[in-house]
Amino acid sequence: TFLTPEENGHVTSLWGKVDVEKVGGEALGRLLVVYPWTQRFFESFGDLSTPSAIMGNPKVKAHGKKVLSAFSEGLHHLDNLKGTFAQLSELHCDKLHVDPQNFTLLGNVLVIVLAEHFGNAFSPPVQAAFQKVVTGVANALAHKYH
């Protein structure tokens, strides 16, 4: 794995306390608010007209949970992220035509949401470990792009 044993401990310890539904919905919602051009992939989700509409949108929350559940699964396979995310990479590349840069943006937003939720427990070493993970996941998701 690309994490040191200490970093792996930080990630495992904190992730056990993460509310996947809440954090996932918030992270995807923030992505759509902060980077409005990402909304074009979610036009079927209904009202995305204001930040409060986005953050309260049940479809955004549900998809955010789905995204973070997949991320959570990836944490069990840090030694094979490309294999773990191969199908999702293909889907987002070939079918949805998502700009792979969006995976990096979402990873960075996730780090911000975790910092907000965990405060002082999200120390610089913990942040550094999570930054490595979200970068690894973003790279794995971008893997199928030509």
Swiss-Prot record:
Red blood cells. The modification N6-acetyllysine is found at residues 59, 82, 144. Residues 2-146 form the Globin domain. One of its GO terms (biological process) is hydrogen peroxide catabolic process. The modification S-nitrosocysteine is found at residue 93. The modification Phosphoserine is found at residue 44. InterPro entries: Globin, Globin-like_sf, Globin/Proto, Hemoglobin_b, Hemoglobin_oxygen_transport. It holds the Pfam family Globin. One of its GO terms (cellular component) is hemoglobin complex. The modification Phosphothreonine is found at residue 12. The keyword Metal-binding applies. CDD domains: Hb-beta-like. Heme b binds at residues 63, 92. Belongs to the globin family. Involved in oxygen transport from the lung to the various peripheral tissues. This is Hemoglobin subunit beta. It comes from Hapalemur griseus. The lineage of its organism: Eukaryota, Metazoa, Chordata, Craniata, Vertebrata.
